[in-house]
Amino acid sequence: ASIFQYFGTKQALYEYLFYYCSSQMKQAYDLSTLDANADFFDRVWAASVMKVKNLKENPYIAAFIGSAATEQSPDLKDILTSAMEEGKRFTEVLVLHEQDSVKFKRPEDAKLVFQMLMLLADGIVSRFENGIDYDSIMSEFESILHMLKYNFYKEEYLL
């Protein structure tokens, strides 16, 4: 009850918690390591490893994000949608660099592949309700990244 006194509404509490979790996730990334990596798919993988490490160390974040993703309240959905869109923009800046498009057979596919990976991440979030086997998810994700790289990159970038 005192929590609701402090925040006033469930909406304000969820908003605070969601932005707190988002901030914690952003801090998990080693930006210099990601920037030093010249390959899009390698940056995506490295960022994913950093994210999963943080989620393993802070299981409450995964639990909250999973419950928030299934929240039905229209007021909360707007806040969560906005926060998730901001998170996607942050991730795009983090892993998709302008020079990445030259490696793709069709340069315009770089942005589409990134968007597809974000949709994949949304699907993975839906698994949070049923418990998380991070190792299995990461193994599957690594295979997907490998497959995408070999299907979308020009031959000279596959060495």
Please annotate each region the language model reported.
Residues 26, 30-37, 67, 100-103, ...:
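Short, flexible helix-adjacent loops and helix caps
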Residues 16, 20, 30-57, 110-117, ...:
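Hydrophobic alpha-helical connector segments
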Residues 1-12, 16:
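Helix-turn-helix
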Residues 17-18, 29, 59, 65-66, ...:
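Short, flexible helix/strand-to-coil boundary loops that buttress conserved ligand/catalytic motifs
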Residues 55-75, 126:
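Amphipathic alpha-helical segments used for helix-helix packing
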Residues 50-53, 89-97, 118-120, 126, ...:
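C-terminal peripheral helix-coil segments that are non-catalytic and often amphipathic
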Residues 62-65, 77-78, 107, 159:
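Short, hydrophobic secondary-structure boundary micro-motifs
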Residues 23-32, 42, 74-101, 111-119, ...:
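Amphipathic alpha-helical packing segments from all-alpha helical-bundle domains
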